[in-house]
């Protein structure tokens, strides 16, 4: 069964919009876990636009599943991860003015810096994933520098303007998943996935986990967090059963 990591960043976005103490990401994590979430993902950005340091600490203390901490491979972030020791860290590219992560890491062009970051996190007992575009060269480089997991960026698939373009992007994701498996990497995927487009991705070969945030939080506004998570889990189960 494919695992579901629920990204709760936008619970914090709503809180920070008014500078209030609510809604609390910890409450959202509890609800997601009750509904079957297999992990909780948070992106601690360097500008602290949504998730705060306190949130990560409290989630570490209270989550019943595991924490997947998304972060830039910067010295301040690495130092925090070494202190907090979340079960998983996903290294992502970060631009201060972007609304959301716009693409995957350039592992090929930043091989030495990322290799050092991966080694430091491994030494702290943290499983490390790299957020990469479904590019065969980038995936091979991720394996070469010691990453355990690649999370494939599904944004181009999600944002494809036509079905033909979406099919092309899906084919590339299939090739990339196969390449990752050949390199001994665990395959995760995420970004831009919704209730309408998740099922083809859930059928990717060797896929172990999906990380989904915005769509689930948006749905939760209408039906509640537990119902939103259960609905996504159902779609994932059905996708795996249907060839």
UniProtKB/Swiss-Prot annotation:
Pathway as given in its UniProt record: Cofactor biosynthesis; pyridoxine 5'-phosphate biosynthesis; pyridoxine 5'-phosphate from D-erythrose 4-phosphate: step 5/5
Binding site for 3-amino-2-oxopropyl phosphate: 7, 18, 192, 213-214
UniProt-listed Enzyme Commission number(s): 2.6.99.2
GO CC terms of this entry: cytosol
Main location group: cytoplasm
Cysteine pairings via disulfide bonds: none
Active site: 43, 70, 191
Annotated binding of 1-deoxy-D-xylulose 5-phosphate, by residue: 9-10, 45, 50, 100
One record GO biological process: pyridoxine biosynthetic process
Compartment(s): Cytoplasm
Superkingdom: Bacteria
Pfam family, one: PdxJ
GO MF: pyridoxine 5'-phosphate synthase activity
Site label Transition state stabilizer, positions: 151
Keywords assigned: Cytoplasm, Pyridoxine biosynthesis, Transferase
Catalytic activity as recorded in UniProt: 3-amino-2-oxopropyl phosphate + 1-deoxy-D-xylulose 5-phosphate = pyridoxine 5'-phosphate + phosphate + 2 H2O + H(+)
The protein's assembly and partners: Homooctamer; tetramer of dimers.
HAMAP family (UniProt xref): PdxJ
Family: Belongs to the PNP synthase family.
Protein name: Pyridoxine 5'-phosphate synthase
The organism of origin for this protein: Magnetococcus marinus (strain ATCC BAA-1437 / JCM 17883 / MC-1)
């Amino acid at each position: 069964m494919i695992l579901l990591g629920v990204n709760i960043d936008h619970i914090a976005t709503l809180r920070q919009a008014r500078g209030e103490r609510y809604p609390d990401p910890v409450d959202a994590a509890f609800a997601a876990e009750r509904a079957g979430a297999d992990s909780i993902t948070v992106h601690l950005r360097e500008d602290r636009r949504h998730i705060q340091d306190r949130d990560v600490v409290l989630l570490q203390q209270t989550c019943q599943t595991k924490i997947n901490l998304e972060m830039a491979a910067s010295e301040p972030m690495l130092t925090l991860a070494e202190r907090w020791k979340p079960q998983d860290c996903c290294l992502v590219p970060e631009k201060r003015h972007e609304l959301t992560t716009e693409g995957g890491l350039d592992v090929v062009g930043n091989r030495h810096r990322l290799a050092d970051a991966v080694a430091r996190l491994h030494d702290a007992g943290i499983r490390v994933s790299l957020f990469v575009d479904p590019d065969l060269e980038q995936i091979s480089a991720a394996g070469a520098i010691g990453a355990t997991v690649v999370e494939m960026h599904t944004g181009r698939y999600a944002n494809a303007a036509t079905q033909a373009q979406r099919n092309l992007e899906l084919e590339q994701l299939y090739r990339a998943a196969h390449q990752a498996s050949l390199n001994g990497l665990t395959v995760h995927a995420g970004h831009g996935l919704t209730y309408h487009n998740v099922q083809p991705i859930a059928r990717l070969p060797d896929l172990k986990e999906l990380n989904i945030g915005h769509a689930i939080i948006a749905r939760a506004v209408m039906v509640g967090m537990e119902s939103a998570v259960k609905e996504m889990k159902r779609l994932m189960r059905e996708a795996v059963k249907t060839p």
